[in-house]
Amino acid sequence: MKQLSQKAHAAAFHAEFFGNTTQKRFVLGINEFADAVANRTNLDGFIDEYTTATEYRGKPVLKLAQVPAGSMVISTVTQARPKTAMNKLLRLNDVVSMDYFAVADASHFQLPQVQALADTQKEYASHPEKFEWVRDLFADQESREVFNRVMEFRLNANLRAMRFFDYTADQQYFEPFVNFEPGEVFVDGGGFDGYTTEEFIKRCPQYGSVHFFEPTETTLIKAKAQLSKHRDIHFHPVGLLDTEQTLSFDADAGSACKISETGSVQINVDALDNRVTESVSFIKLDLEGAEPKALEGMKWHIQEDHPKLAVAVYHDPAHFWQVPEIILGVRNDYKVYLRHYTEGWTETVMFFIPK
């Protein structure tokens, strides 16, 4: 019997799950995508290993071990560990499962696609030549493979393309090609709780200094406590952007905080070129979508210091080409690498290493 293609398999699963099946139907996860599925069909329940709730939307909440044999399950785990979630479902006896990305794709817009994937499909359709340009930039084959797999996932809702990736956040921003010497000056742009700065110090104990940028007061207080045992850390209570100004900020999103017109908190932002006068040697940026504007505000440092850079490009698909366009527009003597640190759409980092 001929094996169905990934899209045909998803279409068949979608038709059965939302048809007149006699099988019990569940979703793994309690979130906006689980709600979207529940709005389209009468589910038999939800599955969640991490809640104490026993009921949601009037339906029972089960643990994985309680899922009846013969059931159908859609996994709505979509961010850091969707592969792990699917593997757990695949281990269940006589349970047919499918990831939400594929089911949403097969629904032909009856279910909302994960925004990162929908945005990538739109951006690629508008600027295919930009993505081809980026693919040709990379300094090694691994970067090209990472790019191809991430794009296959984003463009075709094909989670199988991510089977080569694991959740490796502890390695993020630090790769064998990112070499450190005594006296390094590190800029932690989007420092959050201080974890990345601590990882930098582990790898470069003879550093010169750290410039730590975190705009939310409560988070900065926690970071200062976390980093109190370390020397020569300059805490900047601002976000990084291209100019000095005050903006609204959504502070309720944890490490995914982002600039927002309806944000609950006012924050101050400024350009790195305005805030730091000493030469810097390594810049890390994870600014929840503000990376291109922040790069515009550090062109002097890029030109004069020729620092290593590690820049998150996953927040907006246009950043895959906008970030290298900005940096290489200042000076083009960089090797460019790409690495990915989760099983899903988050945590893709582009590196710029001086030639």
PLM regions and their residue ranges:
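Phosphate/nucleotide-binding beta-alpha loop and adjacent structural elements of enzyme active sites
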Residues: 1-41, 49-355
